[in-house]
Swiss-Prot record:
GO biological process: iron-sulfur cluster assembly
Annotated InterPro entries: Fe-S_cluster_assembly_SufBD, SUF_FeS_clus_asmbl_SufB, SUF_FeS_clus_asmbl_SufBD_core, SUF_FeS_clus_asmbl_SufBD_sf, SufBD_N
Role according to the record: The SufBCD complex acts synergistically with SufE to stimulate the cysteine desulfurase activity of SufS. The SufBCD complex contributes to the assembly or repair of oxygen-labile iron-sulfur clusters under oxidative stress. May facilitate iron uptake from extracellular iron chelators under iron limitation.
Domain of life (superkingdom): Bacteria
Subunit-level organization: Part of the SufBCD complex that contains SufB, SufC and SufD. Interacts with SufA.
Similarity comment: family membership: Belongs to the iron-sulfur cluster assembly SufBD family.
Protein name, UniProt field: Iron-sulfur cluster assembly protein SufB
A GO cellular component annotation in the UniProt record: iron-sulfur cluster assembly complex
Gene Ontology molecular function: 2 iron, 2 sulfur cluster binding; 4 iron, 4 sulfur cluster binding
Pfam families per UniProt: SUFBD_core, SufBD_N
Gene that this sequence comes from: sufB
């Protein structure tokens, strides 16, 4: 391990032992961190540290007050111990890399928000160990998020030459307030649900992207989220806007150190697609999975896209292999006539992981189309659930939907569950739904073993074939990474 990392016995077990989570290292560095607990004073302190304008503070406070009136939902098909929201710190950042660290010791001090203000040598080394480029050189633009703050954003100036805004959420509030105010909360309101309201109250850095009219983004845009501090949550807010006749492909990845207690990740993503625009949004999720109700990330995320204009198109693609519990439904509201929504998902659970994930396709405009391809793989003692909603509104004349929901079981102690909901309120709509549940057959394994292929390699090959419809939608280099993570997650799941 590099000099900035600390390896406990637990970390060594996870990173090099049977469970093989190589991203589980912890970065030792000075931090500026709020005390545990959440109240109105904490919300104000977060806003002050980020030097936000009054309108952003009001957005936070309104969401916090709405959150206080809500009850935490528990209808998902998964179990976790009751969370104590006063036992988390809601702001943690590396002590500013461009000063002598005295600011970190002053209560309420305002941190720097400029580019690379938090990129200390320890933080840069951590991202280097993760294989995430925080300096320009590779033809992919990266926004690197470390706990509550963005520490580096590459290719901003090159993208700006074409009018593309690619920056952290915090920088967008200061540099492009008119755009943030126009779109913030329009797709996911501050009081949308329990975890979205919590996010709106304590929102940390996510990524802000705006692609202007008629521009095709010349490179992949990406964000990497790293949780490092103990007993913190990550609550990034991401907004992506594709103006008329534009195109952008965006991908996000993530990881966290090994911890023996739950950490909460409650993000919100809002995507707005205007007339004739297209967005491809890909996720390779690799949060620390924990084991048998011990540690891991609780991944409770709200993601929603609004296809506002005619002929707009949104594609969600996700590979979910990490986190103790995944609870998320990337969704599309198809308001524009002839708009298209797509959802391609691979969700693998192993060990004692639990997942309740799927999508919602809300058809409002005429001639709207949606496609749902979901692949769920269960191994070990895990439980994997698909939950989807297809809703055809009365105005959605000639709406079309195709749903394919496939589950695969590996072993005798896991479970696969499906909860499809269909609501059709227009007689001209056409909906198709296919579903299968299968096991890896003994004859398949026997065939591979007879040809010198090990049992683990055989299972990996079969599972990759099962997932090919989804992996083909990912950018090539990320599809390769997703396949590797799938293989690692399946290790030692045989038997």
């Amino acid at each position: 391990m590099s000099r900035n990392t600390e390896a406990t016995d637990d970390v060594k077990t996870w990173t090099g032992g049977p469970l093989n989570y190589k991203e589980g290292f912890f970065t030792q560095l000075a931090t500026d961190e709020l005390a545990k607990g959440i109240n109105e004073e904490v919300v104000r302190a977060i806003s002050a540290k980020r030097n936000e304008p009054e309108w952003m503070l009001e957005f936070r406070l309104n969401a916090y007050r709405a959150w206080l009136e809500m009850e935490e939902p528990h209808w998902l098909k998964a179990h976790y111990d009751k969370l104590n929201y006063q036992d988390y710190s809601y702001y943690s950042a590396p002590s500013c890399g461009n000063c002598d660290d005295t600011c970190a010791s002053e209560p309420g001090a305002v941190q720097q928000t400029g580019a690379n203000a938090f990129l200390s040598k320890e933080v840069e080394a951590a991202f280097e160990q993760l294989g995430v480029p925080v300096r320009e050189g590779k033809e992919v633009a990266v926004d690197a998020i470390f706990d509550s703050v963005s520490v580096a954003t590459t290719y901003r100036e090159k993208l700006a030459e074409q009018g593309i805004i690619f920056c952290s959420f915090g920088e967008a509030i200061h540099d492009h307030p008119e755009l943030v105010r126009k779109y913030l909360g329009t797709v996911v309101p501050g009081n949308d649900n329990f975890f979205a309201a919590l996010n709106a109250a304590v929102a940390s850095d996510g990524t802000f992207i705006y692609v202007p009219k008629g521009v095709r983004c010349p490179m992949e845009l990406s964000t990497y989220f790293r949780i490092n501090a103990e007993k913190t949550g990550q609550f990034e807010r991401t907004i992506l806007v594709a103006d008329e006749d534009s195109y952008v492909s965006y991908i996000e990845g993530c990881s966290a150190p090994v911890r023996d207690s739950y950490q909460l990740h409650a993000a919100v993503v809002e995507v707005i697609i205007h007339k004739n625009a297209e967005v491809k949004y890909s996720t390779v999720q690799n949060w620390f999975p924990g084991d048998n109700n011990t540690g891991g990330i609780l991944n409770f995320v709200t993601k929603r896209a609004l296809c506002e204009g005619e002929n707009s198109k949104m594609s969600w693609t996700q590979s979910e292999t990490g986190s103790a519990i995944t609870w998320k439904y990337p969704s599309c509201i198809l308001r524009g006539d002839n708009s298209i929504g797509e959802f391609y998902s691979v969700a693998l659970t192993s060990g004692h992981q639990q997942a309740d994930t799927g999508t919602k396709m809300i058809h409002i405009g005429k001639n709207t189309k949606s496609t749902i391809i979901s692949k769920g793989i269960s191994a070990g003692h895990s439980q994997n659930s698909y939950r989807g909603l297809v809703k055809i509104m009365p105005t959605a004349t000639n709406a079309r939907n195709f749903t394919q929901c496939d589950s695969m079981l590996i072993g005798a102690n896991c479970g696969a569950h499906t909860f499809p909901y269909v609501e059709c309120r227009n007689n001209s709509a056409q909906l198709e739904h296919e579903a299968t549940t299968s096991r890896i057959g003994e004859d398949q394994l026997f065939y591979c073993l007879q040809r010198g292929i090990s049992e683990e390699d055989a299972i990996s090959m079969i599972v990759n074939g099962f997932c090919k419809d989804v992996f083909s939608e990912l950018p090539l280099e990320f599809a390769v990474e997703a396949q590797k993570l799938l293989a690692i997650s399946l290790e030692h799941s045989v038997g």
